[in-house]
UniProtKB/Swiss-Prot annotation:
Pathway: Carbohydrate acid metabolism. It is an enzyme of class 1 (oxidoreductase). PANTHER family: ALDO/KETO REDUCTASE. It comes from Hypocrea jecorina (Trichoderma reesei). Its EC number is 1.1.1.372. Pfam families: Aldo_ket_red (PF00248). It catalyses: glycerol + NADP(+) = L-glyceraldehyde + NADPH + H(+); glycerol + NADP(+) = D-glyceraldehyde + NADPH + H(+). This is D/L-glyceraldehyde reductase. Keywords: Carbohydrate metabolism, NADP, Oxidoreductase. One of its GO terms (molecular function) is glycerol dehydrogenase (NADP+) activity.
Length: 331
């Protein structure tokens, strides 16, 4: 997979397949990470209001535009996301304006609905129930209403709009209601969660997939994918065959791009930022070994298990069966 490879969105804009993710990037690190990524050659940045670091990301972008020879704003594909407390239609454009102000930018390349879940409106990103154990949901606004507001955002402020963490049911509903197909669906995806029915649906509809948590995570007591024996064996095997060092991270990122998908690894160390951007080709044996990991699917990001709990069933996993609510698709 080529580090400079792009795919074309249904809006006609090109999105680089490898992006630089900023989730869980600590203040004091993320600005330097963004600068380093742009210096190395990344041209796709993935951000969100809820990450709490957009101001610093904006400073990293500004520094890169000033110091990386020839780099212009239009060379960088910048994604951000609408947070759950701003799902009321009248709150959508002000939330976009707030993100643009934090970043010091005039426009975004892509704006996503972060989750198909509305929280109680207001300044608090995580409004809590009285006892603090749950996030306060707003069941009086639907994802169809929010999506309609997204599609009506001025093109001068955002070039393409999309969604994140949407299932086939959610996508069907917003497309049917508005006739507008999201440009992107950003989802948890890795060899342990291949999610083939959703991938096939999005391919049929012309929706590009962006994978987050590409390396998995260790919330379930499982090792990170990059630390798993199976992925290490694939990397070792490819290293011998290709006569160069192939790392487990590069293996996962190459797998994530098969079929024209995009992926947004996060790192704040210079060596890893560069390593994640290197081109690696997988052979059929490597792909088969990685696909085997998905025979028993494992999802890591389940809001019902978060603290405070989101009392909502989004993905119909065993963990969510006790949830009191589902996504409000339409009212």
């Amino acid at each position: 997979m080529s580090s400079g490879r792009t795919v074309t969105l249904n809006t006609g804009y090109k999105i680089p397949q490898i992006g630089y993710g900023t989730w869980q990037a600590a203040p004091g690190e993320v600005g330097a990470g963004v600068f380093e990524a742009l210096k190395v050659g990344y041209r796709h940045l993935d951000l969100a209001k809820v990450y709490g670091n957009q101001k610093e990301v904006g400073e990293g972008i500004k520094k890169a535009l000033a110091e990386v020879p020839g780099l212009k704003r239009e060379d960088i594909f910048i994604t951000s996301k609408l947070w759950n407390n701003s799902h009321k239609p009248e709150d959508v454009e002000p939330a976009l304006d707030d993100t643009l102000a934090e970043l010091g930018l005039d426009y975004l390349d892509l704006y996503l609905i972060h989750w198909p879940v509305a929280f109680a409106p207001g300044a608090d990103l995580f409004p809590k129930s009285e006892d603090g154990s749950e996030v306060q949901l707003n069941q009086n606004v639907s994802i169809v209403q929010t999506w309609k507001a997204m599609t009506e955002l001025p093109k001068s402020k955002v070039r393409s709009v999309g969604v994140s963490n949407f299932t086939i049911e959610h996508l069907d509903a917003v497309i049917e209601a508005t006739g507008v197909v999201p440009a992107v669906n950003q989802i948890e995806r890795h060899p342990r969660l291949p999610n083939q029915p959703l991938i096939d649906y999005c391919a049929k509809k012309g929706i590009i997939i962006t994978a987050y948590s590409a390396f998995g995570n260790n919330t379930k007591g499982l090792p990170l994918l990059v630390s798993s024996d199976e992925v290490k064996a694939v990397a070792d095997n490819l290293s011998k065959k290709q006569g160069k060092t192939v790392t487990p991270a590069q293996v996962i990122l190459a797998w994530s791009q098969i079929g024209g998908h995009t992926v947004i690894p996060k790192s704040v160390t210079k060596a890893r930022i560069a390593e994640n951007f290197q081109e690696v080709e997988l052979d059929d044996e490597a792909i088969a070994a990685l696909n085997k990991l998905g025979e028993k699917p494992q999802r890591f990001n389940i809001p019902y298990t978060y603290k405070p709990r989101w009392n909502i069933n989004l993905f119909n996993t065993e963990e969510e069966k006790a949830a009191a609510h589902t996504a409000v698709i339409k009212l």
